[in-house]
Amino acid sequence: MKYDYKAVEAKWQKVWEDEKTFHVEIDHKKPKFYALVEFPYPSGAGLHVGHPRSYTALDVVSRKRRQNGYNVLYPMGWDAFGLPTENFAMKNHIHPAIVTKNNVDHFRSQLKALGFSFDWDREINTTDPEYYKWTQWICLQLYKHGLAYKKEMNVNWCTGCKCVLANEEVVNGVCERCGSEVVHRVKSQWMLKITAYADKLIDGLDGLDYIERVATQQKNWIGRSHGAEVNFGTTAGDTLTVYTTRCDTLFGATYMVVSPEHAMVKEWLDKGILKNADAVKAYQAEAARKSDFERSELNKEKTGVKLEGVMGINPVNDTEIPIFISDYVLSTYGTGAIMAVPAHDTRDWEFAKKFGLPIIEVVKGNTPSNLDEAAFTDVATGTLVNSGFLNGLSVTDAKKKMIDWLEANGKGCDKVNYKLRDWVFSRQRYWGEPIPMVKCEKCGWQPLPESSLPLTLPDITDFEPGPDGESPLARHKDWVKTTCPCCGGPATRETDTMPQWAGSSWYFLRYMDPHCKDAIASKEALEDWSPVDWYNGGMEHTTLHLLYSRFWHKFLYDIGAVPSPEPYQKRTAHGMILGLNPHSFVNLPAEEQEKLLKEYGSQKAAEKALEEKYGEMARHPIVKMSKSLGNVINPDEVVDQYGADTMRLYEMFMGDFEQAAPWQTSAIAGCNRFLDRVWALSDKLVEGEGYRPQIETLMHQTIKKVGADIETLKMNTAIAQLMTLVNALYDNGGATKAELETVVQLLNPFAPHMTEELWEKLGHSHDEQLAYYPWPKYEEAKCVESTVEIAVQVNGKVKARLKVAADIDAAAAIAAAKADPAVAAALEGKQLVKEIYVKGRLVNLAVKG
């Protein structure tokens, strides 16, 4: 009987929904397992094929863990506030709440059609006031503990979204969401003091099971460094403090650089000290148009202006050195001023070469260095020279001695610094959580009473941002005007809203108890489910959501609101699914290729023409999927044509889970054929109890490998092993009932619909569904082959293949080889000069004559 995937999948999805098969409650009799995937932003486009890769992988793990006897929590929800919905709503004149509901309904139906074992009773939505009540509550706690504050500051302003962006949301100088130019503006912003948790965020990684690249990216983003603050005098009578990790090179500082925004530059301009004020102001204006990323690119051309009229004074030798402003120094890192040692820093060397500044060697290596050609930056082998009391010391010892000198002479101190900046928490948009703060002329900023939460968004129709950069909420005076919770006088609400990252910074906690009225979750639920055992997501969220949520969780732990110091015990990441580039020559239809070859004479010339037309990306046959390229694959179409089980199986089989992989439609058909072969085995049952001797070893090997591979996300090799087993069953005339049952069990996490149907077909009752049926066990001793096949070569040419005992010794293997008729014929009349046995693989006989 042919497998009717549409009927079977609809049947089992209804069973799971009607019977709440995957609903979970606290059960202390079982070990808990909390699996988490990043909840999606429900866009109007619906799911793309990239979403199911992560969801399927953890669904496979969750299904196996249930069969291993775990109490599994695997939830799903919606990260539904944010700019794309608001922009769509403005364009189409629909309220964002309606857009969100429609998008969520579409996403939910798509996910259910893929057969994921989510507990839908725990579904959450960040735009639900009963959810964001607790987002607001967390923000109030941050404020009450001094971790939320308002500040006038230089901010990243997206010219497209018309709102402020966090540093992490600016990629290559443009908005990571809409791609518009990002410029700097001065605005009053709410900030969260994530820097107060910098050490905890780094140190906490040590006890976690995060893949190395995730942990490394977080450490690099936080950027903890150990160095010194050094106080340089100036000829204007001021002090310029710099932060350096190389205080050992202080004798080699030949100039200083300050950021264009440095407060001292403004002061010198105001006092008329600078003789080239016009040039300085022009450079400041130019720098203000660049993002921090553009300014700090290592390979960008170094620019700057010397400050005429003031000099710095090196504290170790009282030498006067010039001061420059340059945009490669950022006001947001360190002190906004640096000492420049061009002999031992590449950027300083490039700057010094451009402006003709002195280069003094103060660290000498074991081999001569040519400072005319490059800076010497080898810290490991360097010895101090031309450095007074540091001469002859190693770099490490010189750092310690210099810090001692600075502290003893009141010229500086040791200092730990971080690249991490505080989190810009304001957005000048409508579709976000209202910030629960009011401003009173008498009392200043005041938090709303917790009893008044949630502070809900007003139901308005005019939610376009204004050209002045104010939130659209500011125009709705009836909502803005309120009373001060402290004195009862008139006050105004904060009109900025929270960033999209707010709701996703604690959502994993709400899943534990989504209907709790009195707290983010009940104490019992938090203690039972915390922490998340396994969290999978995209690498692009490593320095955004993942860092923010760890910060919030650590804060909640510190105030006693959650029982674990870390939110996630294990973090893995999946590779992106890529698409074919329609502008690459190799992907063009044959007739189009032929046309180009005729026109340009060769493939190389045709490829060059395509590159001129479409840009550098035309070189790459495989690229990121995008609507503009028309290479986005709709999962609904795949499910309709092949079924959800085929879609799931293919996404797990398409390559190394952690690496990017190209979508190949032809390979989907191969996965579909494999499932058809498994289904057909139910019509090819052979007589016999248990596993037949000729298949028993492979059965145990497969149980072992599939189980281990699932736990290490080596899904592609697990499926390959199942394919090997199914081929072997066909080679042996079919499968016994026990053999097919094991195949069905092992395949179930990947293809749950078909396998549940086969399980029923094999005679199991409805109460014995595979969802909770015990995972098959293997015997280690039976995983070892009792016989192996060895090749027999004569002078390197294979003459025979023999089945021999796996533990056969060399003498017996060689004797068996010589006894084979084909080998004996090849040896006849020849002199045997060498015999080699490679255990379990081959016998090689060398002859002459």
Predicted regions and their residues:
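Flexible, glycine/threonine-enriched loop-and-boundary segments that flank and lead into catalytic domains
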Residues: V214-T241, K290-T319, I323-F324, W423, ...
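NTP-handling and nucleic-acid-processing catalytic cores
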Residues: Y3, V8-Q13, V49, T135-K364, ...
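N-terminal catalytic cores of NTP/NDP-binding nucleotidyl/phosphoryl-transfer enzymes
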Residues: E25-I94, T100, E123-I138, T244-T245, ...
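Non-catalytic terminal extensions that flank enzyme cores
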Residues: M1-G46, V72, L201, A215-S225, ...
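Residue patterns forming the tRNA-binding/recognition surfaces of aminoacyl-tRNA synthetases
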Residues: K2, D18-E19, K91-D248, A263, ...
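Long, charged, mostly alpha-helical binding arms that flank functional sites
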Residues: Y3, R224-E229, G237, K364, ...
